[in-house]
Amino acid sequence: MTYSEMGRKIQTAGTWFVGSFMGEILLHYLECCDDVEKKLSFIEYMHKEYGEALEYTYDTTKTKCYAVFSIIKEQKVVEALDYVLQSNDKKVFDGGKENAQAVLDSIRDGKYKLPY
């Protein structure tokens, strides 16, 4: 995945979504990455836990999660979090950058293991 392709995936998911939920999705990635039923169950959880409150349709939540799954699969987590931190998108400031920095710090400190 090139940097440009990663940027398109981030735009698909939404920069704020990537920053806000990369950690949550990473925690569950290994258990559901190769199992379609578990992946859909996780997306259902994400939708009920967060998507409904954000007024996303189920399909919107699914699209956003799949975009983040592909970033993880292509081993671009650190680059994606850096992208979020460098973003000028004003919407990203509502917790997105703080969460991205916290996940990045945890990865760098070894507290957070990447699935690759």
How would you name each of these model-derived features?
Residues 38, 42-49:
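Double-stranded DNA-binding cores of transcription factors and transposases
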